[in-house]
Amino acid sequence: MEEFQRYLKLNRSQQHYFLYPLIFQEYIYALAHDHGLNRNRSIFLENVGYNKFSLLIVKRAIERMYQYEQKHLILFDNDFNQNRFFGRNNNFSFQMISEGFAVIVEIPFYLRLLSSLEKKGIVKSNNLRSIHSIFPFLEDNFSHLIYVLEILIPYPAHLEILIQTLRYWVKDASSLHLLRFFLHEYRSWNTPNKASSFFSKRNQRFFFVLYNSHICEYESIFVFLRNQSSHLCSTSSGTLLERIYFYGKLEHLVLVEAFAKAFQANLWLFKDPFMHYVRYQGKSILASKGTPPLMKKWTYYFVNLWECRFYLWSQPGRICINQLYNNSLSLLGYISSAGLNPSMVRSQMLENAFIIDNPIKKFDTLVPIVPLIGSLAKARFCNVLGHPISKAVWTDLSDSDIIVRFGRICRNLSHFFSGSSQKKSLYRIKYILRLSCARTLARKHKSTVRAFLKRSGSGLLEEFFTAEEQVLYLTFPRASSTSHRLYRRRIWYLDIICINDLASHELNDSLV
């Protein structure tokens, strides 16, 4: 994000209110191109034969948009489906401009982040981006809580809701008009079945900008309700948006006055100073030390917030009330739970000795072994029972490439699940990947696994055994014994900014 300040060279007032002219600036699309939103091939290529993008394509596309809008009145034309600007086989212009538009709309969010960091005196915020940074917070604060609300945040059902929400963050009317055109035109040629896959796979940045603006509005009101219901109001309401694209939010609440007054009369009855809120992957957790009536009250507030402010119908099962000690949470690829660990303490007074049972509350994180094996089976590393099989599609690669790919997956999983308190599940995953690699190599050479390993030597798959130790030796180089002890403990890394594909159970060949 630091590139924006170098490329844009605009003051803050200009970035807030004059975003529309940036659509015609070539470096905006160069930024979107350099970010590598599409891994295989950029959408900004003029055609397959030219490795460059053209600003002229962008200008021509925008000119056609407004000519089309003036001629056909796209918001009110009855024959809209027959007069589409973006046809079913011509989504090139939509992709190109939407990704550039997403880069531009990110500017107000980034400025709010800079202002928030300056006020709080935070020089570097890279560590806050790490997914692992949330687990130490949970360990420190969730162990003494009792109830938890598991909330599935609803998506806006109407396009105008997204536009009205984004209006609070982007003050440029021309950009909002262009966004309205994008969304209505997009809806006209995409069926409901195609919409989610199109946004998630081809327009990720555009999707997250819209989603984050919706989340900002939703959580601003929630922070207000939280402060009104607490004896000690929080001094900072800075929250993190989706960590794929990281922003911060100021202590600036965009509220509807009528909505605030409607809830303020009853909030004083339920004071709860012990409450923590965490959001991840379209879900959120509200943990409290309160009582069941208090949690039901918050459920009532959330349902009314969605229906009254965002016009969203709350479906059954979107909010679940559970006891933290009796239920586990599927959180960012881990299975987390808060339980009581028994601890025996021997106490002696004069000649009498006593053994005291002193259970300790502990927030634990485990590897979800069953879903992880299911992901490995989906990627054809093993069958549904966890028995390793050969990766047939990789047999055309060289031996070194096959070993490197398997080793990279093994290291990434070990790195991501380093915070697990039980490493035995990781040993099983390593065994599956190691044997799958051996069977893939044996299949390539038309041999058995035993014969291939005997011919190649035992050091062929050595990197599977030493991957974690090498990482720990680099981190703690003083003594090998220290590394072995740390390997058995939980380690949270601050360089993990996205969930491993296997952990999120969404596999594809881009895993490696």
Swiss-Prot record:
One GO MF term attached to the UniProt entry: RNA binding
Gene Ontology biological process terms in this record: mRNA processing; RNA splicing; tRNA processing
Main location: plastid
Alphabetically ordered keywords of this record: Chloroplast, mRNA processing, Plastid, RNA-binding, tRNA processing
Domain of life: Eukaryota
Keyword Oxidoreductase among record annotations: no
Compartments in which it is found: Plastid, Chloroplast
InterPro entries registered for this protein in UniProt: Domain_X (IPR024937), Maturase_MatK (IPR002866), Maturase_MatK_N (IPR024942)
Gene Ontology CC: chloroplast
Pfam families attached to this UniProt entry: Intron_maturas2, MatK_N
Signal peptide: none
Function per UniProt: Usually encoded in the trnK tRNA gene intron. Probably assists in splicing its own and other chloroplast group II introns.
Family note: Belongs to the intron maturase 2 family. MatK subfamily.
Protein name: Maturase K
Annotated source species: Daucus carota (Wild carrot)
